Amino acid sequence: MAKDAIAHVRKLDGLQQLLIDHLLETSTISGQLAAKLNLGLVGELLGLMHDFGKYSQDFQEYIKSVTGINPDADDYVLPNGKKIDHSTAGVQWVYRELRKFGAAQGIGDLFGQMLGICIASHHGEGLIDCLDGEGNPKWIERFNKTDELTHLAECEQNANEAVQQKAKELAGENLIRSLLNAVKPILSDQATNNKIKEFYLGCLTRFLFSCLIDADRINSSDFEREAQKEVRRLAEKPD
């Protein structure tokens, strides 16, 4: 399945965009955007893993059998009423890998939450609600969804080797170090209370989220309108 896994089907002529192409290209764009804050590796990982759940057989069978669908709508509903969640697999993979770092201090866990929330939110109108009305952590329900619903194990088995290898390379110490450099001024400021620190961490998360959203939409739009892609590239060139 890995070689021919599909990400999108072009409305104009039915041309298929391979999932590996969408993931690698979105990763590059997201990395370029996040590099503005020296977080290029973070942006790359977000772009690479945002649609990891599309490697599931359920999703591939669905996109190949149905026309006129929106392949970027999360929680597709099959004719039998079954939903297909294609974003949480990437959430769980990133959270699992990053939380290994600085476990005693909870640093990797924090970064895993930040990136996971970005991926979980990438087809909504903004970041998902992280707390419920009583202040309880709502995000953990998404992160802890069963494998039966997220298909993480299946996606790891089906995914292109190039995607998995790059993901493992990105989710390492250099990425953690870049995030540490970004949050250190926030967390080390003794004059700032915790609520303000959490606000600034939220701002950083929103920046990363915007990098992923822009990259995903740019790549999807370029695939739908190839002529537009060339115009955009020309516009990016300096005079």
Language model: regions and residue ranges:
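Accessory nucleic-acid engagement/destabilization modules that flank
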Residues: M1-D239
